[in-house]
Amino acid sequence: MISRRTFTGLLAAAAMIPTAGFAADMPAPFDNAGDVKIALVRYLSTGDFFQAYLSGVEKQADAIGVDLRVFDSRQDAALQADMVDQAIALGVDGIIIQHGLTESMREAAQRAVDAGIKVVAFDVDVENAAIPQVEQSDRDLARLALEAALEDNGNEFVAGYVYVPGIAPLDRRDETWVGVKAANPGINEVAMFGTLDNPIANSVANQARAVLSANPNITVMFAPYDEFAKGVKIAVDEAGMTDQVSIYSADVSTADIAMMREPGSSWKATAATNPAVVGEVSVRTLAMLLAGEDPGASVIVPPTLITQAMLNELDIKNMEELGAKLPAFAHADVATPEWMPLPAR
């Protein structure tokens, strides 16, 4: 568990800047923000997306000035539920549940609500009307990526599909894939595979090697999570099939950008939100609840389509340049009441 506290009021007074006056205008309990404790309880943490998400959570917590505790269950569902109970026992004011399984999180989330704690869920359906769901608009992520696949390859192709059921964002992306296949009967899905075993990319690469060997006629791989796409690309490269197979994915990171921009790369497009921005929105949504405001049952962060051609044309090499050259990617005007301080840009 990581513990951190930001003494915003003391820093503002020492620096003699107007931040302290701004903080005084914040609603309770943020008029004494350093006394507010929130917890981030994570199910998934491996990979660039989750590191960036955590960075966004930390930056927004810093901007508000709250005490953030981070619990990482490392894909242990029972441990994640226990960590919610640990956060309750610590007397936190709010909890962000990041990913997880509905069956293990449903009762744990309800225990937190029963204890008077405000709860927000990101990409896990805890089936609780009192808990807002922060989403990346996963159906739109899948739709944008698949529209690119259809534009590049037509509506008749042989496809491989990477999917692990039971994870809310992947399930929502799967709904879109099922719909696209139904609307385009010329799409022939010959293989579905996937794993969340760590390291995810290497584990998926092992599966993809076997899939490509058994199905050398595959021309499109839909891998709607960037760690899946990394694994598929490893296998495609090793099989010498970069000219034959095109990969379409969801999510993005600096490492992904580098792989997409490799000469002749098979990774053609990804649809993504900025994971750091999603982390910021998660904290802001929780802060609104704590201030007695209603962020809505569903808080949606809109995605952007990022193509290999776009990255090359704009010479984008990392996430910082992506945000600078695509401003819509750098910030989401979501959960931003007037009193809410934002991280420095």
State where each predicted segment sits.
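N-terminal signal peptide c-region/cleavage motif recognized by signal peptidases
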Residues: 18-20
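N-terminal export leaders
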Residues: 4-8
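Absolute protein N-terminus
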Residues: 1-2, 96
